[in-house]
Amino acid sequence: MEIHLDNYLPEYPSFVSGIRRAPDRGYSLTPAQTETALMNALRYIPVELHEKLAPEFMEELLTRGRIYGYRYRPQGDLKAKPISEYKGKCIEGKAFQVMIDNNLCFDIALYPYELVTYGETGQVCQNWMQYRLIKKYLEELTEEQTLVIESGHPLGLFHSKPDAPRVIITNSMMVGMFDNQKDWHIAAQMGVANYGQMTAGGWMYIGPQGIVHGTFNTLLNAGRKKLGIPQDKDLRGYLFVSSGLGGMSGAQPKAAVIAGAASIIAEVDASRIETRRCQGWVQHVTDDIGKAFSLADEAIRKKEPISIAFHGNIVDLLEYADKQGLSIDLLSDQTSCHAVYEGGYCPVGVTFEERTELLAHHREDFCALVDKTLKRHFEVIKRLVARGTYFFDYGNSFMKAIYDAGVHEISRNGVDEKDGFIWPSYVEDIMGPELFDYGYGPFRWVCLSGKPEDLIRTDHAAMACIDPTRRGQDMDNYNWIRDAEKNRLVVGTQARILYQDAEGRLKIALEFNRMVRDGEVGPIMLGRDHHDVSGTDSPFRETSNIRDGSNVMADMAVQCFAGNAARGMSLVALHNGGGVGIGKAINGGFCMVLDGSERVDEILRSAMIWDVMGGVARRSWARNPNAMRTSATFNENRGEQYHITLPYIPERAFIHEIVQTSLNKTV
């Protein structure tokens, strides 16, 4: 067996007009580092081609800030095909090719030519040489081998066993003292670090649908907790305002409409607005702020849902609302603030095109404008909150970016970020206590046949597995899957997102595998977002409602990754950064190919429970009440095979008295 790139020069691809391109990421290497970067890229290429490609790669590095190897990108759109159309020696090898191509197709990817799936910087891998080599490896992969991927680089095939993962991925796992944006930027330019975000580098993205259910849950529960909306009502008559219509943030208008709300979503990039308009995810587009609020006001009076895309800056929109005394019920932000100085956040007074020019030629000026805008953004939110608006950070590192811009007033303890910020994140206030602490999270699947009828069958099967009377969350999830087809959520592969707890996920997974076994549907890929109960440690998002001091620890995410590998998930991935940025999160996920076998049933029975309950156990040990109750019930129901350590809770007044008495003695 010999696997390498072929000894011929592919034709340079033609770039399709109208397809978004990533901005210049910035070149800041020393001459010695530049030489290393060039050598790193050329090590994929047969020596005979170096003379031709070295100048080409050098030009990419200087003008794009990365070596993408555009020449090695296949021509045209990389749409995911049915699994039967891929070459491979095992079903997993074929299945992962479906997932990779879906992440990079024009309908899905934010910057397809730069391998960015979503989130401004989330890449499948670093360059097109890696893409081609990964595909070759997946075609050769057998059920007794594991493919190892390190920051996009296919390290090789290694002998394993059928019950081991077929693919193990890590992305940007920086050594501690270098785990920061500056050193990562150097490593990325040199071609040794890939920002996989979550499901981009984890090969499990399902389009903006992947976050619609979570956004729907967040908005609905925000309305119940903060606006007094009854359990059986929705957000009709209320206004939600936010920003961002990209690969993740694009879920906001769709989720708001499903939840019944009127929504205005600001977006500076006209192409992203057009993408959502063509998909039917926004109903109205305007660059007139007054018209945007007028349309929303009419829908609010009629108690009808509406989605409005405002082409402009969110700060302008909010300052207008503040000056006019307009009411906003729910307010958030989903700009890519994990990459706030790399183009993820556009300064006020600057067009999207001007932002791209500033990034390329005047980066310091751009960064100064970003800081200035963040401060204005903070001030206007503060005024709106004082008038009754409920603002929540959507886990995009927005409040951390404000803090880093010099606004230490946003820090809860006035000293640092360890105790969080003055406004809650959506995990802190809503997602954590209402969903994660019970084990509910973003379970998902892809019908690898590509047949819509397979997705419909799985929708019905999943719905039959849910008891809507068990909990309020189950009723919401039942209604979600009942209406999923009607809501036209699919973009790219035939896929579905559905929040479920541990028992629900296992029940659905086993039913799906039976359906594959009995020939009712084709093979299925199971997975989840890394943004889940157990998958991610980040004090700025997923573990922001952990208050025992362990919110800065990443043991949970690493243990989840290792446990899923040990139990035989088809693919396991572990990344640095997630949705909040390098050094601010450790996150992991999995893919599990359902082939109908009894072997897969056994893996599911072990791995699906672990993947969820490891996180519930950690949340319980942090003394989260709902997680403690969930863990106690789990011990009662599954005590023969499992047992979670439960905390004893001392009285707070007793502890306070002990501490104060002891400290007073030392004064």
Task: Give the predicted meaning of each segment.
Residues 257-259, 322-327, 348, 407-411, ...:
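Short, solvent-exposed amphipathic alpha-helical segments in soluble enzyme
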Residues 295-304, 309-324, 328, 626-665:
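C-terminal domain-closing interface element
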Residues 146-151, 169-170, 242, 265-266, ...:
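General beta-strand structural signal in soluble alpha/beta enzymes
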Residues 100-105, 109-113, 186, 192-199, ...:
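Catalytic cofactor-binding cores of redox enzymes
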Residues 290-508:
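Core active-site phosphate/anionic-ligand binding loop and the adjoining beta-turn-alpha structural block
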Residues 140-145, 260-261, 327-330, 383-390, ...:
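Structural alpha-beta junctions
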